[in-house]
Structures are given as structure tokens and as C-alpha cells.
């Protein structure tokens, strides 16, 4: 069985939806950011502040190399995983990629209370969301399937993913 890989901007529901999908299918749930934190002994925000985004992306790429060969996993990636083509090639080789989407406004509303998002620790987080989304959207669109999460519960999004995955699998994954 191929892995189910969730990509998308922060605040689109990758972790909450991923846990539901994994539970319903009996797959393991893997949050790439959690794997990074466990491997480094540091929070993501600490890695960003001490070493910068580039070093974080190097670590992320290494963790993806370790994670992807295993089967029957739901993998929730960080929002910037798409910035490195090598990550997407690996994830696609061993998985079906689902992009979770939401509008800038919805993302801002979902994230405005959080303090653990290093890329949003700026003077104007709304503008930063818009800027990052514009840069990443063409990369997110390379997913096998895109699901708009606005107005849907995590359970409804999970059901859409499972339905599409099972249709696609049909004994092949």
C-alpha cells in the first residue's frame, strides 16, 4: 500500500486530518515536523532561529529520506516541503499526494493565535501568508489531488481523502 502524503500551507489541517485518516485506515501517522523535533531535540522555531530556514530544509529533506520507504503511513509534511524538488520526488515515488487548501483569510484566522510558526513571526503575518502562498501554490498544485478544506470539518476532509485513495488504490497501491 502506498503512503498517503498530505501537503499544503500551514493551517490547512494536515495534522488533524492526517491523524483521522491514519486511524480509519489502520495506517501509522507520521508528522514530519515531530520527527524533526525528536531527531534534533529542538522545536522547529528553535531550529529556525539558531540555524535558519536553509538548515531546517536540509534536516527536513534528510528526515523525508528516512520516512518515505516505509509503507502504510499517513505523512503530514511541513508547509515548505514543496520548496525542494527532491522531497516531492521521494514523496510521490512512495505515496499518493493530497494537497489541502484554504484561502489566505481562513489560514490567517486559523493561525492568528499560534506562536509556534516561525515564518509568521513578522510584523504583518497576513501579508506574509499571502506572499508565501503565492510562491508555494504552483508547487502545491503538483499534488495528485487537491482538496479545499474551507467549510469542511476535519472528518469530512478525511473522508474525501480515504474515498479518493481507495478509488485510486483498487488493489494497486
Curated annotation (Swiss-Prot):
Binds 1 Mg(2+) ion per subunit. GO terms for molecular function: ATP binding; magnesium ion binding; shikimate kinase activity. It is found in: Cytoplasm. InterPro entries: P-loop_NTPase (IPR027417), Shikimate/glucono_kinase (IPR031322), Shikimate_kinase/TSH1 (IPR000623), Shikimate_kinase_CS (IPR023000). Its main location: cytoplasm. Belongs to the shikimate kinase family. This is Shikimate kinase. It comes from Thermodesulfovibrio yellowstonii (strain ATCC 51303 / DSM 11347 / YP87).
